[in-house]
Amino acid sequence: TKFSHLNKEGLIERAIDLVDYFIEEKNENIINDVIKEFNSVANMNPMLTNAEIKTDIQKINSNMKEITEYMTEVKTTLDKAVHGHDKAKKQIERIIGQWINGEQDGYCFGFEGPPGIGKTSLAKRGLSDCLKDDKGVSRPFSMIQMGGDSNGSTLHGHNYTYVGSTWGSIVQIIIDKKCMNPIIFIDEVDKISRTENGKEIVGILTHLLDPAQNDCFQDKYFTGIDLDLSKALFILSYNDASDIDKILLDRVHRIKFESLSLEDKLIISKTHILPEVYKKMGLEDMIKFDDEVLKFIIDEYTCESGVRKLKEILFEIVGEINLDVLKNNDKEYDFPILITISDIKNKYFKDKREVIIRKVPDTNLVGYANGMYATSLGNGGTLPIHAKFFPSEQFLELKLTGLQQDVMKESMHVALTVAWNLTPETKKQTLRKLYDGEHNKCGINIHPGDGSVQKDGPSAGGIITLVLYSLLNDLPIKAKFAMTGEIQMSGDITAIGGLNHKILGSLKAGVKEFIYPKENKKDFDDFYEKYKDDERLKDIKFYEVDHISEALELIIEK
């Protein structure tokens, strides 16, 4: 039968075996099978009384009920800690479920995402409160800041023979928290110094996170004394995974946090930020922000994936109101004070510059198109790409300006090769004649906008190819299009990163039609599922392509 593997001498009295199987199946209907199996075994083993069987079944029922209640509490706690991030929370729930069924050894999470979106809050007010002892006390939480750190002694101390030496932060946490299994949150791991000393820090962290070694961690101050940190829970927090040592990154269970949507920011403003601001200013129920005002502040005065700048701005506005109330005791106020967009622009922020968003042109132009960019901080937008002929001694010499880095430069050369091979032979002959003529005008200068900002990566390869094709063939590019995608020598358009950031930022610039790689279909589907009801996507068109020829048909005006 289904439980025949449990029907062995010595196991019959151990309800825990059935409980383990029961939990593993996660199906409450299986309890009937458990009861039938107990009855069957009881018939074969007359030494078992009905009372003993009922007691074991009650234990199973009770244990399963406690687990169900606990997992429900876990979800509630995580939701209360931060708004949104459902995928990240689900991964944490899965790991906690694994701890219930399996071993409860230490673990290492990697919280990956832009700043200000709730990574620390989810760890401190969420995960910490989910992990409680039998007295209901939350697992102790400690934080270590690694941004710019260049000294390994921060973590594992100095040798005690040095004057003024002391132990490292890991031992200090154990001393402060009085336990060997705290939650240790190590922030800004991607900002660790790139020097040799920085490599030492990476080596220490790699040792700390290795389950085969972290049961014998040694602090230099306590030489020869092993510290068992195998039960500790480590959380590394970082913005850009590409800046982290690959061996260290391989040690962590990566959990990606997405940028907050406009709706997310609205909810967080009303449920978390404003109540906190009002409380600190002593102005509860005395000020009111409508949704339209909050949207205006978010769109016009912040350019971020999270809510740090938004929180700072709301503190500033409420602080101004508080100051006004304190200075004008004789003035009568109609509470709650309703903040308007006019108040923001003409009173509180009359000297503050709004975020400047460069709009895409209205006219179709030759040798000009809209690329797209995304940063590790979760921002994105359009990247204007210009190409013009210039006098040159070399036919089709490329002059690359705008602080382009190595990968982007290589992409430019590939784009030129592809664009040249797409150009009709008659047009090639015309260009050669121009080069041989007295004008001597056939070098090409390619310049992406914002010349003071470094740019790198292959994702602009596709749009650069179209810009060069436009220039070589004297054909304008549709102004309201934007494209992202890496170009291959074959003309294939391949996957890129940060698609959602690129689209959201480009919408602000006035882009109406988007071209993206077919290989990014999953990324686009995730994006569209989240934003399909957003007003900003009304009348916006999206096209997926896997070859540059498809993009040419869409974007080149003929």
Predicted regions located by residue number:
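Conserved C-terminal "switch" segment of AAA+ ATPases
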Residues: M64, D133-G136, K178, D240-D250, ...
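Conserved catalytic/switch belt of AAA+ P-loop NTPases
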Residues: D190-D226
